[in-house]
């Protein structure tokens, strides 16, 4: 908008300063004149085309008579016209500033919407153009009053003229024509009518400006009643600017009327004084209103600052409260998670106890049926009064159901490698034998279930393990594994050469021989190795792949290996071929201690399912044969600090570290089982996870400890922190579930005398079964002499139920009337089947 008004003023100023001769020469129809017209499309901020046409016509009508006179008159008129245009520009700038503060000026480019200010300006410029026209100059040259000083007609219809102080005189030597003198009255009348119209128009504009001023004052009064401090201040500023613009407009109009129009009417001094006082009063009132609004604005700003401070404080308090509540919720969530974990653990323990109790009851029932069947057969064949031959403590070998009894659910045997120095290790061979080690001047003595001398044969070792192997035909789970340092003969004891087979070939031969004596079983074989904590199938058709070990579904229990192949074995020859295939796929390597060292743990699992009476269909026994990799020191094995770029040395070091960690985890499991801890860390390694079914409740584990000839190997077997603790002092259990100290041995290998001795030991009455171990009771066999008195009734033992599991029991708790001093059974068993000391 500023550019538009500035351009308009510049055009008017240039139009009236043009040389008179050039203006006269430029005709409307001149080609040069038409060539100078602007081309292209019109700018949107320019006035309407009709206004441009009117201004162009006014400019063309101003033609001086000659060059000299036009120059002289142009200079005289330029001074007053420039002053008027400067005032007009000042007024327009103030007016535009007020309009922009209100929200922007109106669009002048729209057709038919020419502002009234431009109309007044065009009329004023038309008057100026008439003064510069030949007729106006003739009037000036004739000595008449200029057009700006023409008075409007009087009320009686006559016109009067006033001489300006600076009137022009006629130029000497220039005569006036008769025609000009004749047209003078007509011209004066036309000028008088034009001045009257102009005066009326200007007075109308003044009235409009006054009305706008009154409207702005009314708007200012309404603004005083407003509530918003910021809007009031903006409105005051806007009204102030608009008031200034109106004052400038009024002053400009007055100056134009005083300079170009008729003189203002003479007012009395008293009226002027009253008007001045009224204006001063209005000004004072406006100033007072402004000050009041400013004071109100300051008060509201103070209130706003206070509210902002309160809001900030409230936000901080709310944020702190939310954070505190969030922390409390996190704490409660952590507590709920821990409680949920404990509840899940208690539920799992309870399920394990229920499953174990069910299995033990089924085993006891099956065993009792077999014994009853054998007793009935013996009585029917021998008649009444038949007694067993001297030296025979059980049913003969050919009778169905005749199997050697177990001597405990955890048994530890020790075998010395030939060539062991007697200065380092001294033994007392036989059942309940002792092993005494001497290392760095310190002697330690271990008592084990059985100690084999260095010259013991493979047959002697297997003869002691045969009862445990054959017990899997009655539905038991048996695990036999060897433990020792690298080079102590573990693989030799388990496999053995073809001419002198070890435990595995002899156990398989004994099982198939026993099954061939009239029993029908289905034999399933699986073989895996644990290499660097990776479980691989050694009997898979393709290359060995890593298998995933998972917990079995709820209600079934056990450990499941996804993708493991199970093979049905029809005969012994096929079984040996498959075992040979599995051994060839096992990871072995040469170390500084052994030419062919096993670098992984091998686990052979045989599952035997009975399919004919007297065993019910579905009864299954499991035999786990484990060949553990030897524990070793990295320095002695040649794997300590391998040089860079030696992949074999780095691989040996990693294998040794993994083997030692898994054996240490196995030692932790054994220690937990020995101490009857409620939690057994089976998940510490893949080895213990796979052995969890073999080391759980109702199973039998036989550990064959291999001791080498060197001093370092003796040290490895007796250093518990860094190696798997040798389970020599582990407690073993009788066939009826009684716990017997590992440091005391039975006086004889006879099952009858061993059972009598175990139940008659002084410290046996105070022992308790480990948590979760419910073992089946074995029948009491007759002996030539009277048995030792029992310290407590022969019954199924159970461990204290965990608190989380006890809370979930819904069965009624009853006390056993036959055992005074007893407390209610958490399992809700009927009287006489449960006994528990306070």
Swiss-Prot record:
SUPFAM superfamilies: P-loop containing nucleoside triphosphate hydrolases (SSF52540). Residues 409-740 form the Kinesin motor domain. One of its GO terms (molecular function) is microtubule binding. GO terms for cellular component: cytoplasm; dendrite cytoplasm; kinesin complex; microtubule. InterPro entries: Kinesin-like_fam (IPR027640), Kinesin_motor_CS (IPR019821), Kinesin_motor_dom (IPR001752), Kinesin_motor_dom_sf (IPR036961), P-loop_NTPase (IPR027417). Residues 186-351 form a coiled coil. This is Kinesin-like protein KIFC2. It comes from Homo sapiens.
């Amino acid at each position: 908008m500023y550019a538009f008004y500035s351009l308009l003023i510049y055009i008017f100023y240039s139009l009236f300063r043009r040389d008179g001769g050039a203006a006269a020469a430029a005709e409307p129809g001149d080609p040069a004149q038409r060539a100078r017209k602007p081309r292209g499309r019109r700018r949107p901020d320019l006035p309407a085309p009709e206004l441009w046409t009117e201004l162009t016509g006014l400019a063309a009508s101003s033609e001086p008579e000659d060059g000299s006179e036009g120059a002289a008159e142009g200079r005289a008129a330029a001074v007053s016209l420039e002053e008027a245009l400067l005032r007009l520009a000042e007024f327009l700038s103030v007016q535009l500033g007020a309009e922009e503060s209100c929200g922007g000026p109106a669009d002048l480019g729209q057709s038919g919407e020419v502002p009234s200010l431009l109309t007044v300006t065009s009329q004023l410029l038309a008057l100026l153009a008439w003064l510069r026209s030949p007729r106006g100059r003739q009037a000036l040259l004739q000595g008449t009053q200029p057009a700006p000083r023409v008075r409007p007609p009087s009320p009686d219809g006559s016109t009067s003229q006033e001489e300006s102080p600076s009137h022009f005189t006629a130029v000497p030597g220039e005569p006036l024509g008769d025609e000009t003198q004749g047209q003078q009255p007509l011209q004066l009348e036309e000028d008088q009518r034009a001045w009257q119209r102009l005066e009326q128009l200007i007075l109308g504009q003044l009235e409009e400006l006054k009305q706008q001023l009154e409207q702005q004052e009314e708007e200012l009064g309404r603004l005083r009643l407003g509530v918003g401090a910021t809007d009031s201040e903006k409105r005051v500023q806007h009204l102030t600017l608009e008031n200034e613009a109106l004052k400038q407009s009024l002053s400009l109009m007055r100056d134009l009327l005083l300079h170009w129009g008729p003189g203002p009417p003479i007012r009395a001094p008293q009226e002027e004084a009253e008007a001045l006082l009224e204006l001063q009063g209005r000004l004072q009132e406006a100033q007072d209103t402004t000050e009041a609004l400013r004071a109100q604005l300051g008060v509201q700003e103070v209130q706003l600052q206070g509210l902002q401070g309160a809001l900030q404080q409230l936000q901080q308090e709310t944020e702190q409260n939310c954070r505190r509540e969030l922390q409390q919720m996190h704490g409660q969530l952590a507590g709920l998670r821990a409680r949920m974990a404990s509840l899940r653990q208690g539920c799992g323990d309870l399920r394990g106890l229920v499953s174990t109790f069910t299995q033990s009851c089924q085993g006891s029932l099956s065993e009792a049926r077999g014994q009853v069947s054998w007793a009935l057969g013996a009585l029917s064949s021998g008649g009444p009064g038949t007694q067993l031959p001297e030296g025979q403590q059980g049913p003969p070998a050919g009778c169905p159901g005749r199997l050697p009894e177990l001597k405990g659910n955890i048994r530890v045997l020790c075998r010395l490698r030939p060539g062991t120095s007697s200065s380092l290790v001294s033994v007392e061979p036989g059942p309940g034998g002792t092993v005494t080690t001497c290392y760095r001047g310190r002697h330690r003595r271990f008592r084990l279930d059985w100690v084999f001398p260095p010259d013991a044969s493979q047959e002697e070792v297997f003869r002691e393990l045969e009862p445990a192997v054959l017990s899997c035909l009655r539905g038991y789970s048996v695990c036999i594994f060897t433990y020792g340092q690298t080079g102590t003969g573990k693989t030799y004891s388990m496999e053995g050469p073809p001419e002198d087979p070890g435990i595995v070939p002899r156990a398989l031969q004994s099982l198939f021989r026993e099954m061939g004596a009239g029993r029908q079983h289905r034999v399933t074989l699986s073989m895996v190795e644990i290499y660097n904590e990776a479980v691989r199938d050694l009997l898979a058709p393709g290359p060995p792949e890593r298998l995933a070990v998972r917990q079995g579904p709820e209600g079934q229990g056990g450990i499941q290996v996804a993708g493991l192949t199970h093979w049905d074995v029809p005969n012994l020859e096929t079984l040996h071929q498959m075992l040979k295939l599995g051994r060839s796929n096992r990871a072995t390597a040469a170390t500084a201690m052994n030419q062919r060292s096993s670098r992984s743990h091998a686990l052979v699992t045989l599952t035997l399912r009975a399919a004919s009476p007297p065993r019910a269909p579905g009864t299954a026994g499991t035999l786990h044969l484990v060949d553990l990799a030897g524990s070793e020191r990295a320095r002695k094995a040649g794997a300590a600090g391998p040089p860079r770029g030696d992949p074999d040395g780095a691989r040996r070091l990693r294998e040794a570290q993994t083997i030692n960690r898994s054996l240490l985890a196995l030692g932790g499991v054994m220690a937990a089982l020995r101490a009857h801890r409620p939690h057994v860390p089976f998940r510490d390694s893949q080895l213990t996870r796979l052995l969890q079914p073999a080391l759980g409740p109702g199973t039998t584990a036989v550990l064959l400890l291999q001791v080498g000839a060197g001093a370092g190997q003796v040290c490895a077997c007796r250093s518990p922190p860094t190696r798997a603790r040798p389970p020599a002092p582990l407690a073993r259990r009788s066939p009826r579930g009684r716990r017997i100290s590992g440091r005391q041995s039975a006086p004889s290998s006879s099952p009858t005398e061993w059972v009598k001795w175990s139940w008659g030991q002084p410290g046996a009455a105070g022992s308790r079964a480990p948590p979760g171990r419910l073992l089946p009771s074995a029948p009491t066999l007759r002996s030539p002499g009277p048995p030792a008195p029992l310290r407590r009734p022969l019954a199924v033992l159970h461990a204290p139920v965990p608190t989380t599991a006890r809370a979930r029991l819904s069965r009624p708790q009853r006390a056993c009337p036959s055992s005074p001093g007893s407390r209610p059974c958490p399992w809700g068993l009927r009287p006489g089947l449960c006994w528990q000391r306070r």
